Regions:
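A glycine-biased structural micro-motif
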Residues: 186, 211-215
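Cytosolic regulatory/linker segments at or just downstream of nucleotide-handling modules
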Residues: 215-221
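Residue-level signal for beta-strand positions within conserved beta-sheet cores that form or flank
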Residues: 25, 172, 213
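Active-site-proximal segments of metal-dependent phosphoesterases and phosphodiesterases across multiple
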Residues: 1-11
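Secreted, luminal/periplasmic, and some membrane-associated catalytic domains
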Residues: 13-158
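Terminal low-complexity/disordered tails
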Residues: 201, 206-210, 221-222
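Substrate-binding rim/cap in mid-to-C-terminal beta-strand-loop elements of soluble/periplasmic
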Residues: 55-89, 158-204
């Protein structure tokens, strides 16, 4: 397709530029990506349900006046923020509500991860309390009014035909292509987590990332 053709063109131009200055034999070329995309067919607004359950409160004009929990849609996952995470009663109430929504199959997500669970699983961290994972064809918005489910609308970039932000088990898997003086030829390795990428590149450059979450992919390094 056009995108692959353009990528190949610009990659070739970079390689040719390095060859022109006589540094090809001293240069490592690394081609990779952080994620792919999956097709989505609908857009979910779980804040509408939080509002119905009383976790989001508004005035007569639908302006938020107070909240216990708010969901920020970020593509094919959503981050749940609590106003006061130290309020254990509210924490449990929100957690129970999210799991009930998950189990219903109506709101577009099939997993509810706590912050601790998603940090251990995917190295994702932040000031959120929970992460909601897509069912594989739903992306998420942050609205708290109107319908919970919207059909795909490509006129709004937030609700386009495809999105990312999901667990890496879904969708096309990005590849890593590496060649140059630091890499072995003809070596193929199985899937590795993306946190291994930076330590691998660093080691190829002779740098030790001692505090990195991942580790070098030594199988491809000389």
């Amino acid at each position: 397709n056009d995108m692959l053709d353009h990528t190949a063109l610009w990659t070739q131009r970079i390689i040719e530029a390095v060859e022109e200055i006589g540094e090809a034999e001293n240069t490592n070329f690394i081609i990779t990506s952080d994620h792919g995309q999956i097709d989505v067919s609908r857009w979910a607004m779980p804040n509408v349900e939080l509002r119905r359950r009383g976790f989001i409160r508004t005035d007569a004009n639908d302006v938020i006046t107070d909240y216990d929990a708010f969901i920020k849609g970020v593509g094919c996952c959503a981050l749940v923020y609590l106003k006061d995470e130290s309020d254990k009663k509210t924490y449990k109430a929100v957690y129970d509500a999210l799991k009930e929504m998950r189990d219903s199959g109506l709101y577009g997500f099939t997993e509810v991860f706590t912050r601790e669970e998603i940090a251990a699983k995917e190295h994702l961290s932040g000031p959120f309390s929970f992460v909601l994972e897509t069912d594989g064809y739903t992306s998420f918005g942050s609205e708290w009014t109107g319908s919970i489910i919207h059909q795909r609308d490509i006129t709004d970039y937030r609700g386009g035909a495809a999105s990312h932000g999901y667990l890496p088990d879904k969708g096309a898997q990005p590849t890593l292509i590496a060649c140059g003086p630091s890499f072995k030829k003809g070596v193929t390795v199985d899937r590795r987590p993306i946190v291994d990428l930076a330590p691998t590149i660093a080691k190829a450059m002779g740098v030790d990332l001692a505090d990195a979450n991942g580790k070098p992919i030594d199988e491809i390094l000389l």
